Amino acid sequence: MNLSEDVLKGIETLSDEKLINDSVFKHIIDTCFLVILKKKTESDLFDNKAVSSVDTIALKQTFSAFIVFILESMKINYDQSSISDLLEEHKLSSSRIDFISNYFKEYRVAIRKHLSVTNFHFPHIIDVNWRLDLFMKSNAVEKLNTPVYLINLTTEQEENVKGKVQFAATLDQLQDLVFKLRDAQKQIERSSIKS
């Protein structure tokens, strides 16, 4: 697992029983797992009175480092023994390693499921409806006779989450849009050939 120096320092800070006593340690671990599952927020970290004795900067660094550690180990699906070995390398006591291992056992499935649906996708166009309208006249001009296309795009953001994009365009604007889309397609094809 490739972890940055900051993350490794944060994990080593968890091993310092003088800086982080057992009650603070348990609170940090509990909060980390529940923040990932969105059952708690980061501000809940400071709700415990025992945390007030710990340096705020060290607490925040340790908290963020352990969140990264959890996410990275879940992302590559590290097994319990690998997690224990890594924590042991960074000087955590066996009781603390066991405590963390129990949380991994308890929340592994839920976190992996949560990570599988936690991603960002641009909306995909799944349907297009259009209608041709004709503006006959306006307040300023007696006769206009301009064709206008009313376009409705149905998009899909995530699983079964649909949205709508509606706009009106003249023939020139529509041709310009088609030209720009074709240009973008060519650029993507060129970049995929290069790589």
UniProtKB/Swiss-Prot annotation:
Domain COMM: 124-192
PROSITE patterns referenced in this protein's UniProt entry, alphabetically: COMM
InterPro entries: COMM, COMMD3
Pfam family, one: COMM_domain
Highest taxon in the source lineage: Eukaryota
GO BP annotations, alphabetical order: sodium ion transport
Family: Belongs to the COMM domain-containing protein 3 family.
Cited function: Scaffold protein in the commander complex that is essential for endosomal recycling of transmembrane cargos; the commander complex is composed of the CCC subcomplex and the retriever subcomplex.
Assembly, per entry: Component of the commander complex consisting of the CCC subcomplex and the retriever subcomplex. Component of the CCC subcomplex.
Record protein name field: COMM domain-containing protein 3
Organism for this UniProt entry: Dictyostelium discoideum
Phylogenetic classification of the source organism: Eukaryota, Amoebozoa, Evosea, Eumycetozoa, Dictyostelia
